[in-house]
Amino acid sequence: MINEIKSDAQTRMDKCVESTKTQMAKVRTGRAHPSLLDTIQVPYYGSLTPLKQVASVSIGDARTLTVSVFDRTMIAAVEKAIMSSDLGLNPMSAGATIRIPLPALTEERRKDLIKVVRAEAENGRIAIRNVRRDANSNVKELEKEKECTEDDVRRSEDDVQKLTDAHIKLVDDVLAAKEKELMEF
């Protein structure tokens, strides 16, 4: 039973780390990256559709994204969706493709983005600690129900703490890499 609680905690902590990585990937750096446009929804036949379902996104060069729309009638809608996103991008259409130059980040904007990234990392750490708290309380419930000994509880808490420390270190490593990426250029 304790092993099930520990493996559940491991799985949930892994998900917390992945979620933190995903949230940090959404933060724009100075480099062009196709995942930058993953959150954009385009109106298509009356419903909002993810951009990657109506177009392919590729890297033109280090500071330019190229969007190739599958249906030429969608070019204006895709362009409007990119403009209205909160990414601060200014697309230019050229025939069947849309070029999106990425403006250089100012020092002030970099510092703001670093604050955002640090907040995301802290949210990840908090989520991991909440998983630890849940796992420890589940083990204490087992002790109250006399399904395990006090030594088992202590051992389990130590194991869960080691898991927590390892996962928080992963979040810190992701944060350090993202901060380094933001301060380049």
UniProtKB/Swiss-Prot annotation:
Keywords: Cytoplasm, Protein biosynthesis. One of its GO terms (cellular component) is cytosol. The keyword Zinc does not apply. The keyword Metal-binding does not apply. It comes from the Bacteria. CDD domains: RRF. GO terms for molecular function: ribosomal large subunit binding. Pfam families: RRF. It is found in: Cytoplasm. Disulfide bonds: none annotated. Gene3D superfamilies: 3.30.1360.40, Ribosome-recycling factor (1.10.132.20). InterPro entries: Ribosome_recyc_fac (IPR002661), Ribosome_recyc_fac_dom (IPR023584), RRF_sf (IPR036191). GO terms for biological process: cytoplasmic translational termination. Belongs to the RRF family. Responsible for the release of ribosomes from messenger RNA at the termination of protein biosynthesis. May increase the efficiency of translation by recycling ribosomes from one round of translation to another. This is Ribosome-recycling factor. It comes from Shewanella halifaxensis (strain HAW-EB4). The lineage of its organism: Bacteria, Pseudomonadati, Pseudomonadota, Gammaproteobacteria, Alteromonadales.
